[in-house]
Amino acid sequence: MDQAIYTLHEFMLHTKNWTYILMGVTLLVYVGYWLFLTGRDEKIRKY
């Protein structure tokens, strides 16, 4: 962060932006992990 935050409004916008970025990254990681876990299942053999 190379510029100063002078008002509460600027601070709130900055933290809100980072919150949305982190939420998006967390969602992508969660979906990737879920696909990794469910992709390892073997097919059920029907005799």
Swiss-Prot record:
Record's bilayer topology term: Single-pass membrane protein
Q: Which terms are listed as keywords in the entry?
A: Cell membrane, Membrane, Transmembrane, Transmembrane helix
By its UniProt entry, which InterPro entries does this protein fall under?
sulf_resp_HmcD
Q: Give a yes or no for keyword Cell membrane in this entry.
A: yes
Q: What is its main location?
A: membrane
**Membrane spanning stretches:** 18-37
- Localization (cell): Cell membrane
This protein's GO CC annotations: plasma membrane
Q: What does this protein do?
A: HMWC (high-molecular-weight cytochrome c), ORF2, ORF3, ORF4, ORF5 and ORF6 in the HMC operon form a transmembrane protein complex that allows electron flow from the periplasmic hydrogenase to the cytoplasmic enzymes that catalyze reduction of sulfates.
**What's the protein name?**
Protein DVU_0533
Question: What organism does this protein naturally occur in?
Answer: Nitratidesulfovibrio vulgaris (strain ATCC 29579 / DSM 644 / CCUG 34227 / NCIMB 8303 / VKM B-1760 / Hildenborough)
